[in-house]
Amino acid sequence: MATAATTSAAAIPTGGGGRRQHPHPRRPGLRPRRLHRLRLPAQAAAAAAASSPSTSSSSSSSSTPAEGGGRLVAELVGAFNELTGRMGEGLATSSSSRLLFRALKLALPALRDGDGGRALARALAIAASLADLQMDAEVISAGILREALDAGAISMRDVKSEIGISTAHLLHESLRLKHAPSKLDVLDDESASALRKFCLSYYDIRAVILELALKLDMMRHLDCLPRYLQRIKSLEVLKIYAPLAHAVGAGNLSLELEDLSFRYLFPHSYDHIDQWLRSQETENKLLIDSYKEQLLQALKDDDELSQIVQDISIQGRYKSRFSTMKKLVKDGRKPEEVNDILALRVILEPRCDGSSLDWGPRACHRTHEIIQAMWKEVPGRTKNYVTRPKENGYQSLHVAIDVSEPGKMRPLMEIQIRTKEMHKFAVGGEASHSLYKGGLTDPGEAKRLKAIMLAAAELAAMRLRDLPASDQGDSNCTNRAFCQLDKNGDGRISIEELTEVMEDLGAGGKDAKELMHLLDANSDGSLSSDEFEAFQRQIELMRSLDDKDDRYRKILKEKLQTIDSAGLIQVYRKQLGDKLLVS
């Protein structure tokens, strides 16, 4: 997620008679500077719009229109493109696009001031997590707006009137969930389990997922809290929210919540596990890559498998620090007995042919036979959930392989074999398998929750489904951001349409005219799709440069601090001012 591109704008001109009052009016006494009336290329406009305006203690400096309203448009378009790009094709309908666009227009001016853009960055990071989980536009919109709602920058009435009742309902439910742990006097296993079941039974499942994304963002930025609060929050997440993430099928999110909680609750133990796993990963990386290549080639070369499978992918598997700790400490295993240090997952996509319904299981078993011919299978360790699925419907074939060589002992390699459909069922939002990891061991309870989740998803899909007649204009438009700005559907963005979005963002008509002048290459007074796409390309370039700058800054800060602490360099703040600080 590009965080640098979401840095809040400086004071923004509000001229043009805004359609809505915003909570952050222009500071009195500051007047915007005008750009020279020169014909500038699109990259100059994007650079002016996307880069952060310089700030100083002097009250005489203010933002240019391109640095104000134009920059907000760049943020709006960039964020919109990223979120719709993360959503699946089936989710990014034109109805969904309109909803996301409205949510971003409401959130951007509400979050642009106050803390250097951190609130806006958090809101967009949460929205990106929800998009990665393939949630619908209502949930993603609620994720965008929750930060502004918590800060008091918008009200629930604003959400209802400008976004919709369904999104407001999700926000209301997530706020109730936020305070659910306060109902517990003691956070023991029994109480935590009861609270998890209560949350899954009495709250909107999509609001639960929204709250999980919020907790993940909180855990990623826990360093800013006092030590005792870090531990309290981490214990709460480990006992309640990480198992909830398993229960709703968000397995990767659950793993990250567990590992972050482990890191703050038991930092020394976490460091030991992390260093050991990193050493194992470094030592075995070339080995794993070699095994993946060998296996993939063997599967592709098999004639029998090629007849029933159209695609094969082999993935590595993330090594959970928390799970590894439990195996070593709770289960009492020795390091050499931790068998998923070397781990692969084979995902097969059977050919689409209704004449044979058993091609998926056949492909899994044929893959198993090929693996047996390549390596030594460990007797008694194979688990065939393809032929005999678990009660909750989980299907996969698990194999343990001995890859040791004479004089060179290695950990066992675990390989999971499943079809694409089985994989979706196992790790997606429809997987009852995850409900067991979430503490719901009753199959009937798991099936009931699955039915609730599917019903909620179907209801949202019906609301956001495109209507052929009303959405015909949008369906013919390939650039979703352009469609949202081209209100009348004539294939061009007029100055009136650009002014309208500027006013929605808290800027004004002067900013719109300035941005139009910068982007309108043929001077016809409007923006064509080609001119707008050139602007979009430059926005993405600026966002990627900001991302790289942020990464380089962190690397250099760490390296220069190390050098400075060793006494190898001395930097005088008085000489360099704020240009280079090594502390």
From Swiss-Prot:
E.C. numbers: 2.7.6.5
Residues where Ca(2+) 1 binds: D486, N488, D490, R492, E497
Modulation of this protein's activity: Activated by calcium.
Gene Ontology CC terms: chloroplast
One annotated GO biological process: guanosine tetraphosphate metabolic process
Ranges that cross the membrane: none
Keywords attached to this entry: ATP-binding, Calcium, Chloroplast, GTP-binding, Kinase, Metal-binding, Nucleotide-binding, Plastid, Repeat, Stress response, Transferase, Transit peptide
UniProt main location, coarse: plastid
One Pfam family matching this protein: RelA_SpoT
Region Disordered: start-end pairs: 1-68
InterPro entries referenced in this protein's UniProt entry, alphabetically: EF-hand-dom_pair (IPR011992), EF_Hand_1_Ca_BS (IPR018247), EF_hand_dom (IPR002048), HD_domain (IPR006674), NT_sf (IPR043519), RelA_SpoT (IPR007685)
Classification via PROSITE patterns: EF_HAND_1, EF_HAND_2, HD
EF-hand domain: residues covered: 473-508, 510-542
Residue stretches making up the HD domain: 119-219
Binding site for Ca(2+) 2: D520, N522, D524, S526, E531
Location within or outside the cell: Plastid, Chloroplast
Entry-linked Gene3D superfamilies: Beta Polymerase, domain 2, EF-hand, Hypothetical protein af1432
Catalytic activity: GTP + ATP = guanosine 3'-diphosphate 5'-triphosphate + AMP
UniProt tissue specificity: Expressed in roots and shoots.
Transit peptide: first to last position: 1-69
Annotated signal sequence range: none
Role played: Possesses calcium-dependent ppGpp (guanosine 3'-diphosphate 5'-diphosphate) synthetase activity in vitro and is able to functionally complement E.coli relA mutants. May be involved in a rapid plant ppGpp-mediated response to pathogens and other stresses.
Family classification: Belongs to the RelA/SpoT family.
Name used for this protein in its record: GTP diphosphokinase CRSH1, chloroplastic
Lineage of producing organism: Eukaryota, Viridiplantae, Streptophyta, Embryophyta, Tracheophyta
